[in-house]
Amino acid sequence: MTHISERLLVQAHLAAKQPRVLSEQESAEHRAAIAAELKAQNAVLVAHYYCDPVIQALAEETGGCVSDSLEMARFGNQHPAQTVVVAGVRFMGETAKILNPEKRVLMPTLEATCSLDLGCPVDEFSAFCDQHPERTVVVYANTSAAVKARADWVVTSSCAVEIVEHLMDNGEPILWAPDQHLGRYIQRETGADMLLWDGACIVHEEFKAKQLEDMKALYPDAAILVHPESPESVVALADAVGSTSQLIKAAQTLPNKTFIVATDRGIFYKMQQLCPDKDFIEAPTAGNGAACRSCAHCPWMAMNTLERTLACLREGSGEIFVDPALIPRAVRPLKRMLDFTQAARLRQAGNA
């Protein structure tokens, strides 16, 4: 499998001109205009934790949702709005459309993709699956609609371990894609028989154990929070490992006052909102400035700006379309995930 196209697209994006920074007055004007458009168009704004703080705050202020990809999918599926504006990366918009084909789904830009999605082209992935027909195909949500349509299950990082444990209990060997680091983490946690694709997230793969150990020495009382898309050596240093929502919960419940966080720094908005008396520090990446590709912030998440959000509402640009022939096949593994997690919630409530 090749990652030439992935590397070229990453390099092209990082070399592109970045959006201008709005003044405080311009920012306020854009926020007010977006709120008015959302109301006028019966639309709701859904933002991922990795988006810039101003976008997350706007989603909250306008009655939308700020969450991980699982809750984004659930919220968009259950909300009555006829238009869903997804501030995130393209697979999130596609997921919203698959679950809500009758709704209009907009994104601030269709160029906001994901290195995991780029690194798992459907033709190569389908051939890989065909070579292992005895395996249950489980894919991470960070994949295209076409890859989801080839899968038996879709999972997010917040439910992956539980779903793989369920499949393991049924004696099912698993073919996993695309994130190799998350796949290995699930293997270690469950002992499942898993064959792994070799994709990786450009943000999380940059975290390095040696630099993290050095930072821990500077902050010996800090707890280390790590997303499982990070390399195994980084995960091994963690006090808590989990999805974005699980890391936020850990920040709330652990007694530490300082946290070193190995995930996208966009998550600090929600962590600081919920834990105003605690300090959060970015985990070190492989380099600094021009030496790192992401510097702990997804370059595609950063494309979700106020200007682009307003433009997509006013112009109807950035609309997500999914091949109607794919939707029935792609919705099946997504619904399995949503039904499984809903049943797990009910069981937890019953045991509370």
From Swiss-Prot:
**Record-level GO cellular component terms:** cytosol
Q: Which InterPro entries match?
A: NadA, NadA_sf, Quinolinate_synth_A_type1
| Enzyme Commission designation | 2.5.1.72
- What cofactor(s) does the depicted protein rely on? [4Fe-4S] cluster
For this protein, the record's Gene3D superfamilies field holds:
NadA-like
Keywords annotated in UniProt = 4Fe-4S, Cytoplasm, Iron, Iron-sulfur, Metal-binding, Pyridine nucleotide biosynthesis, Transferase
The entry's [4Fe-4S] cluster-binding residues are C114, C201, C298
What reactions does this protein catalyze? iminosuccinate + dihydroxyacetone phosphate = quinolinate + phosphate + 2 H2O + H(+)
Top-rank EC class of the record's enzyme: transferase
Binding-site list for iminosuccinate: H48, S69, Y140, A141, N142, S157, H227, P228, E229, T244
Set out the biological process GO terms recorded for this chain's protein. Answer: 'de novo' NAD biosynthetic process from L-aspartate
Entry's Gene Ontology molecular function annotations: 4 iron, 4 sulfur cluster binding; metal ion binding; quinolinate synthetase A activity
Q: How is the cofactor bound?
A: Binds 1 [4Fe-4S] cluster per subunit.
Q: Return the Pfam families for the record.
A: NadA
Pathway terms, separated by semicolons: Cofactor biosynthesis; NAD(+) biosynthesis; quinolinate from iminoaspartate: step 1/1
Localization terms from the record: Cytoplasm
Entry superkingdom = Bacteria
- Known PANTHER family for this protein? QUINOLINATE SYNTHASE, CHLOROPLASTIC, QUINOLINATE SYNTHETASE A
Please give the function described in this protein's UniProt entry: Catalyzes the condensation of iminoaspartate with dihydroxyacetone phosphate to form quinolinate.
Under HAMAP family, the record lists: NadA_type1
- Family as reported in the entry's similarity comment: Belongs to the quinolinate synthase family. Type 1 subfamily.
What name does UniProt use for this protein? Quinolinate synthase
Give the source species: Pseudomonas aeruginosa (strain ATCC 15692 / DSM 22644 / CIP 104116 / JCM 14847 / LMG 12228 / 1C / PRS 101 / PAO1)
List the top taxonomic levels of the source. Answer: Bacteria, Pseudomonadati, Pseudomonadota, Gammaproteobacteria, Pseudomonadales
What gene name is listed for this protein?
nadA
